């Protein structure tokens, strides 16, 4: 048997090494404040912060986009069971009109020159608007047109051009839903077959990434106050990745299937020629354990605003990963995609999606009118 001789002070050296290692880990690992914290249960704002802004007795609006000049855009997708127009503008005098005009909202005609199935809108800092047209006006039927992006000058109210989504990036069951744009790149989520499409706008080329990735696939049911959101036939509504936003600097995108958790991806990986397929699968980070969402938007400072359909709440999440429950109110019946103006207001459609025709065997049970609420955001830091 071999006997190992112990060197003098070996115990001291080991202790010193452990102390040094512990100190190194303390520096390398994030402090507890760096991790995301739980969403507060008590809302910060009182009921008086939420006031009716406008209403519709014919359409279920699922998204709102405030324009810098005080006008407001509303999306009313065909798949929900809405009559036209699918995109409309509320002028400063309170009147409504199809947007950008009646021809682009026509129910028939050349699919390349009209909105077939509105599926997402996003306003850029330069004042131009991008509209996603999925080409799928009925989620239970095949596509009737090739999906496209429509670029609109909101000052002149004219279409600047369109970008067709390449068919090679699509699956037969693809239903595009959700768009975010930074400079010359558009990011589009696929809610029919989970994935994200990256569109180079100048070349009109499209590439597909994260195909059927678990984080983007509907693995959890959409929860509403009464239980699970179901289609009219009783099946749980399974909708893959349909919500997306890009950070103001274009470095990150966040994506989510309505019932899943929020994921974050660094956009540079999409243009990295050396990344392997295996590494690509690992680039997705779970960013927050969100509840079921009806929509989200991002502010110029990177703050995310979420519509929580499980509790009829509006939540926010800062770049420092600080969550806030801004308001909870039963009037926010299935809140949709909110719109942020430049004056500290968030506009939220209470879209009652669970009562729309698509979820009620073709016959809507919506309590009219559908209301868009104005929420005055807090100007103070979150409570500690």
Predicted features, each with a name:
Residues 57-68, 110-128, 132, 168-187, ...:
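Beta-rich, blade/repeat-based domains predominating
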Residues 137-138, 142-184:
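Asp-box/WD-like beta-propeller blade repeats and closely related beta-sheet repeat scaffolds
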Residues 51-85:
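Beta-strand-rich domains and repeat architectures in extracellular enzymes and scaffolds
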Residues 93-130, 134-138, 142, 161-169:
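Blade-loop segments of beta-propeller domains
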Residues 155, 201-206, 265-275, 377-380:
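Short loop/turn segments immediately following beta-strands, especially the blade-tip
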Residues 96-105, 160-165, 207-222, 272-286, ...:
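Beta-propeller fold detector
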Residues 73-104, 140, 153-155:
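Beta-propeller domains
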Residues 74-80, 131-135, 140-142, 188-192, ...:
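Conserved beta-strand positions in repeat-built beta-propeller and related beta-rich domains
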């Amino acid at each position: 048997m071999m006997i190992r001789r112990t060197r003098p002070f070996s115990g001291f050296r080991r202790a010193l090494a452990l102390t040094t290692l512990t100190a190194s880990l303390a520096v390398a690992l994030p402090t507890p404040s760096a991790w995301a914290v739980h969403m507060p249960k008590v809302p910060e704002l009182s009921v008086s912060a939420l006031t009716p802004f406008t209403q519709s007795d014919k359409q279920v609006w699922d998204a709102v986009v405030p324009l810098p000049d005080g006008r407001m855009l509303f999306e009313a997708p065909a798949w929900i069971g809405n009559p036209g127009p699918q995109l409309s503008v509320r002028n400063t005098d309170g009147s409504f009109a199809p947007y950008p005009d009646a021809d682009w909202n026509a129910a028939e005609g050349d699919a390349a020159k009209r909105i077939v199935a509105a599926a997402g809108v996003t306003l850029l800092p330069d004042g131009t608007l991008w509209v996603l047209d999925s080409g799928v006006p009925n989620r239970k039927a095949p596509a009737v047109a090739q999906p496209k992006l429509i670029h609109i000058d909101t000052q002149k109210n004219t279409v600047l051009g369109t970008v067709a989504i390449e068919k090679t990036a699509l699956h037969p069951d693809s239903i595009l839903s959700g768009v975010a744009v930074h400079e010359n790149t558009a990011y589009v989520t696929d809610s029919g077959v989970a994935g994200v499409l990256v569109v180079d706008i100048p070349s009109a080329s499209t590439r597909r990434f994260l195909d059927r990735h678990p984080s983007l696939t509907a693995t959890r049911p959409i929860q509403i106050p009464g239980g699970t959101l179901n289609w009219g036939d009783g099946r749980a509504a399974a909708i893959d990745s349909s919500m997306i936003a890009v950070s103001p600097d274009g470095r990150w995108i966040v994506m989510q299937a309505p019932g899943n958790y929020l994921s974050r991806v660094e956009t540079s990986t999409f243009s990295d020629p050396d990344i392997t397929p295996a590494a690509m699968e690992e680039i997705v980070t779970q960013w927050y354990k969100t509840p079921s969402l009806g929509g989200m938007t991002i502010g110029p400072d990177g703050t995310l605003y979420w519509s929580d359909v499980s509790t009829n709440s509006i939540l926010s999440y800062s770049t420092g990963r600080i969550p806030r429950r801004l308001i909870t109110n039963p009037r926010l019946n299935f809140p949709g995609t909110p719109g942020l103006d430049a004056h500290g207001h968030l506009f939220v459609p209470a879209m009652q999606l669970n009562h729309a025709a698509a979820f009620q065997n073709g016959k809507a049970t919506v309590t009219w009118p559908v209301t868009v609420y104005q929420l005055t955001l807090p100007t103070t830091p979150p409570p500690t």
